[in-house]
């Protein structure tokens, strides 16, 4: 299941940091990403591979470089499937609480 891969990828703080870096500046090379991480290139590459497997990051070759781009679609799908329904429920509970407190 694709959502399982997304949750696994998001479960690591380094991978979340990589996604944050790509949100700030999309299309970075491995070297550019490693400048902001305290780890070896090989470790960063392994994290990027997990993000690619979850379809959260895609790469494009430009000459000898690989550029890494964030793919927001899986994050949006997780939001729609898992977060949004709880958000609606929370808003409904807050509305009911407001009505109760205001004596309506």
Feature-to-residue mapping (PLM):
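Beta-hairpin "wing" of winged helix-turn-helix
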Residues: 52-63, 69
């Amino acid at each position: 299941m694709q959502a399982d891969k997304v949750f696994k990828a998001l479960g690591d703080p380094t991978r979340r940091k990589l996604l944050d870096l790509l949100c700030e500046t999309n299309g970075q090379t491995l070297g550019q990403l490693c400048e902001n991480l305290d780890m070896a290139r090989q470790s960063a590459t392994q994290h990027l591979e997990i993000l690619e497997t979850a379809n959260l990051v895609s790469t494009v070759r430009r000459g000898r470089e690989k550029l890494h781009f964030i793919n927001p679609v899986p994050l949006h799908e997780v939001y729609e499937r898992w977060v949004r329904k709880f958000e609606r429920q929370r808003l409904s509970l807050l509305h009911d609480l407001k009505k109760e407190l205001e004596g309506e």
